[in-house]
Amino acid sequence: MSKPIPPLDLMWLLMESQASPTHVGALLLFEKPKRRPNCVREIVTAYRSYAPTPPFNYIPELRRTRMPRFQEARTYDPQYHNHHIALPAASTYADLLRLVADLHESMLDRDRPLFRNWIIDCVPDDRFALYVKVH
């Protein structure tokens, strides 16, 4: 299935460059539930268990020979889109923010659905984080 790219989405895709990416990101912090010691692993498993639904399964098709369209992804790699990482021992919130800044810097791969998630374990104060990057 394919569908026309809405004008606002198309504007962001056309304006984007390596020097000026136009994706957005969100960092969410959570307290670990006291009675769920494996909650982070459970979340990672859940995220990797489901294929994305529209619009998160679309890939932009920007050819000069036809109207720009979103094409449904033929394949989906849950490991690529849903990462599980842990901060090193004794990390601080500043370390978390540096990590997220580094993750945010690169453009999303336009040959794959335009989102990535990082579930980040070992955040200070017995927390975990979710960093979401979308176009």
Predicted regions, residues:
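Non-catalytic N-terminal regions of enzymes
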Residues: 1-135
